[in-house]
A protein has these predicted regions:
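Active-site glycine- and acidic-residue-rich loops that bind
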Residues: 36-51, 124-126
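Catalytic core of soluble alpha/beta enzymes
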Residues: 11-21
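Short, solvent-exposed cationic patches
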Residues: 201-212
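His/Asp/Glu-enriched, well-ordered alpha-helical/loop segment
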Residues: 21-34, 55, 60-61, 67-148
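Active-site beta-loop-alpha junctions enriched in small/polar residues
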Residues: 7-11, 64-66
Length: 212
């Protein structure tokens, strides 16, 4: 079988956005933040991506998280576009954006949201049913989600080690409140309280549940 993904930037950003309409000079250098592969397309393509998520033509929403700082690393390409490091940050805000614009705006159901961010990736990567499901014998990995929590995305408050956000100023409704990993509370009321070094190696099947 074949599997496909998209990312929040392709669902929510487009060539028509103002920050991309510059000439890559000192005055209009913001566009360097959005140099990644594949490049952004026209806004008219976005409804088809949402439709693909609803119909399971797209099985996963990832981020292609590849952060380069704007002030020093992206600036390497100021005199030569081809030297702009390719990639952008996004892993921290994936669930917030997908819940707000997916569930909150009626693009898919809450059940489909869970499938896209949990059970489908676990199957594809050969970790199901240890991950991606609440069942006897599975890891007790839980996210308690507050659908009414309001949050404004900003580089000033995010935890990623990068000096900008592709979604700066986006207002979202819905956020993780508590997170349990293997039954242990590691995020409480939005604050990380886990112990360093508690991770475990996950042996994956070469052909996991998605292939069966």
């Amino acid at each position: 079988p074949a599997f496909a993904e998209t990312c929040p930037q392709y669902l929510l950003l487009s060539l028509e956005d103002n920050m991309l309409n510059d000439d890559m000079t000192d005055k209009g250098w913001e566009g360097a933040k959005y140099v990644f592969t594949p490049p952004l397309r026209e806004k008219r393509n976005q409804p088809k991506l949402w439709e693909g998520l609803r119909k399971d033509n797209l099985q996963v929403v990832s981020t292609d998280h590849c952060p380069f700082c704007f002030e020093d690393q992206k600036a390497l390409g100021k005199n030569d576009f081809t030297k702009i490091p390719n990639g952008g940050p996004g892993i921290e805000n994936r669930l917030q954006l997908l819940h707000h614009h997916g569930v909150g705006q009626g693009n898919f159901s809450i059940n489909r949201f869970v499938e896209l961010v949990s059970s489908a990736p676990a199957r594809i990567f050969g970790m199901y049913p240890k991950k991606g499901v609440l069942a006897a014998g599975s890891d007790a990995d839980l996210v308690l989600w507050d659908p009414g929590a309001l949050y404004t995305i900003s580089a000033a408050t995010h935890h990623m080690r990068v000096d900008y956000s592709m979604f700066e100023g986006f207002k979202v409704k819905g956020n993780a409140r508590d997170v349990y990993s293997r039954g242990e509370l590691i995020v409480s009321k939005g604050e990380f309280i886990g112990k360093p070094g508690r991770g475990e190696y996950l042996r994956r099947e070469a052909r996991g549940g998605a292939w069966k």
